[in-house]
Amino acid sequence: MTLRIYNTLTKQKEEFKPINEGEVRMYVCGPTVYDYPHLGHARTYIAFDVIRRYLEHKGYSVLMVMNFTDIDDKIIRRAKETGEDPAKLAEKFIKVFLEDMKALKVKPADIYPRVTEHIEDIIQFIERLKEKGYAYEGSDGVYFEVQKFKEYGKLSGVKLEELRKGARVEPGEGKKNPEDFALWKKAKPGEPKWESPWGEGRPGWHIECSVMSSKYLGESFDIHGGGNDLIFPHHENEIAQSEACFGHEWVHYWLHTGFVMVKGEKMSKSLGNFVTVRELLQRYSPEVIRFFVLQKHYRSPLDYSEEGLQHAKNNLERLYNTLENIRIAMENAELAYTWDENDFKAYNSIKEARRKFYEAMDDDFNTAEALKAVFEVSNAINKYITEAEKPKESVLRKAWEFFRTVGEIFGIFEEYFKEEKAKEEEKLIELLIQVRAELRKERKFELADKIREELRKLGIQLEDKGKETIWKRIKV
């Protein structure tokens, strides 16, 4: 099956073809770290977590980068309000963010670059833009001259003439045109600052992501993602400055998540209608929150309500009940020497639902449709267990493996399969102990010691007691 992705840049679904076969380089805009993450943030990071998991499931090697904006107007403003040092404030909320994402079972990015650790890279990028004639120095900083980038607006659809209507350059601003945006801001009293060719100051917001993404993913990469609210001006400005600098197409696929809505309004800090991840986790499990998010396509608005979360909880419990029914049935199931009509019917239902699941996921990661297929399997296998005179282990195993796959992609059912995984690990350890014992009998001590050392690196310690070897888990 061919994976098709909706590209915000072209406003249509396109066949996904990475730049390098078998490899996906992906950048997701991370948080500005000045407060606790809320459900609106979590929705975006859960969505991209599932996208990443599905790409990996399809066999791609994914390199994922997510930045931390650890210096920004919002951070400076909050630090002044609380009397904290901006750097310490940012560090505190980086820790909070990482803890919250771990709690939500969001896999860590491969690289988490911070703005404050890439100041020199940012300065060099701005100098390249100046050399190419796209940037100029004003009285209060360095600006990108938007009108010089002829494709400005190709992501968001905004027109320069519309931006200029009613806009004006305020007195004291150093930019030539209202639409120009800051690449470097000259220092104001009491603000964090760094040395640069244009005097002390700090980076503008948009330049940060262009610099950090291209440093780790190259001057062209596959996927750039974030929330809908970043399409303009942030991502539009990123494209302008990056393609002006590099002289070619920068990102191939732009993906954006829909808003979380509360009574018809976007969930946001400014409106005060938000619920933090930590507040949600006091009432619901991480898997319920993930399930709630995945019931909607990632580009669609997601309506937040307690009723919606409770509905997600009930639906997830239904699937857990199905897993338990399968587990119990497998303990008493027969090996299949022949199949009857019920066996074929259940097997074909699972096979068709599995096809629908992958068809939905290949259609722009449509988790909402994919979940319908999951419930089709749930209904079919429960019916089979109830009606079949003697359920066959092979049919039950097909459903079991399907649920395991869904769990790995969606980040759910983890607790259920954890016990089974532990049993499989124990069998493998016991097998290695037997192999090691045979090697010792044959006086191949070097290989026997190699097994012991490799297991120790994995947190398994072997202890020889006479003719017996026991093992225990240790911290590594």
From Swiss-Prot:
Gene3D superfamilies documented for this protein: Cysteine-tRNA ligase, C-terminal anti-codon recognition domain, HUPs
The Gene Ontology terms for molecular function here are: ATP binding; cysteine-tRNA ligase activity; zinc ion binding
Q: Localized where?
A: Cytoplasm
Q: Which cofactor does it need?
A: Zn(2+)
Motif 'HIGH' region in this chain: where? 31-41
Signal peptide segment: none
Keywords, ordered alphabetically:
Aminoacyl-tRNA synthetase, ATP-binding, Cytoplasm, Ligase, Metal-binding, Nucleotide-binding, Protein biosynthesis, Zinc
Q: Which InterPro entries match?
A: Cys-tRNA-ligase, Cys-tRNA-synt_Ia_DALR, Cys-tRNA/MSH_ligase, Rossmann-like_a/b/a_fold, tRNA-synt_1_cat_dom, tRNAsynth_Ia_anticodon-bd
Catalytic activity of the protein: tRNA(Cys) + L-cysteine + ATP = L-cysteinyl-tRNA(Cys) + AMP + diphosphate
Listed Pfam families? DALR_2, tRNA-synt_1e
Q: How is the cofactor bound?
A: Binds 1 zinc ion per subunit.
- Which positions does the motif 'KMSKS' region occupy? 266-270
**Which HAMAP family does this one have?**
Cys_tRNA_synth (MF_00041)
Q: Which NCBIfam families match?
A: cysS
What is this protein's name? Cysteine--tRNA ligase
